């Protein structure tokens, strides 16, 4: 289904990082070429070997890792990507992306990508609702990022509220919507009318059409 498509998964330092292992597996089973980039903090929650085993690709954390196969890894990978999903996205990484800071492999590669970029915030409710975080998310949308609203439920801190990373199927659906569905209507303007229309020729005459005979 996704053969020939390349997806970058950006994983940041959140307890919800474990969900991305399952997402990576789901994408791989759809024959997608999956590359995982992790922040250093993310490695405290899940080991890079997990992603390497699931995707058959090297999981990159260090920008200056000399064991990569491309000359300029972050640029080469960015050129190949069809979509980037950063999930879970911490408040820290969201702030970096909102202001173009590129100080690790994940943020550097994202900045170099020209494809669709999707961010899925995951954090404490108060952190998510903080005016600064909300402003950063709004700023990302102004730069053509798509933001997935967090789910509501019990968080790692035992609070109940919004801030949970959505389930893997929801995240997968966002990716599929972007790269697996034909967009043959993209750029086409469609007019929907509930009855007869009239277009003036001059102050006296007009062109019209019959009613559809559909009544509500």
Segments (PLM) and residue ranges:
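Conserved small/polar residues in nucleotide/adenosyl-binding loops
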Residues: 214-216
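A cross-family phosphate/adenosyl-ligand binding-site feature
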Residues: 1-118, 124-210
């Amino acid at each position: 289904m996704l053969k020939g498509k390349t997806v970058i998964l950006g994983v940041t330092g959140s307890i919800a990082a474990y969900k991305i292992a399952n997402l990576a597996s789901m994408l791989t089973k759809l024959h997608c070429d999956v590359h995982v980039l992790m922040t250093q903090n993310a490695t405290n929650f899940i080991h890079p070997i997990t992603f390497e085993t699931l995707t058959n690709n090297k999981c990159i954390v260090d920008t200056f890792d000399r064991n990569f196969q491309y000359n300029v890894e972050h640029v080469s990978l960015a050129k190949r990507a069809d979509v980037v999903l950063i999930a879970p996205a911490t408040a820290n990484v969201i702030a970096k992306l909102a202001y173009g800071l590129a100080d690790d492999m994940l943020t550097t590669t994202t900045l170099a990508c020209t494809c669709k970029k999707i961010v899925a915030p995951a954090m404490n409710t108060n952190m998510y609702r903080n005016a600064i975080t909300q402003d950063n998310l709004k700023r990302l949308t102004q730069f053509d990022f798509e933001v997935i609203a967090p789910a509501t439920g019990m968080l790692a801190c035992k609070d109940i509220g919004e801030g949970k990373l959505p389930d893997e199927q929801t995240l997968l659906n966002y990716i599929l919507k972007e790269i697996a569905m034909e967009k043959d209507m993209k750029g086409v303007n469609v007019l929907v009318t509930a009855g007869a229309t009239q277009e003036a020729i001059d102050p006296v005459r007009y062109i019209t059409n019959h009613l559809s005979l559909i009544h509500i």
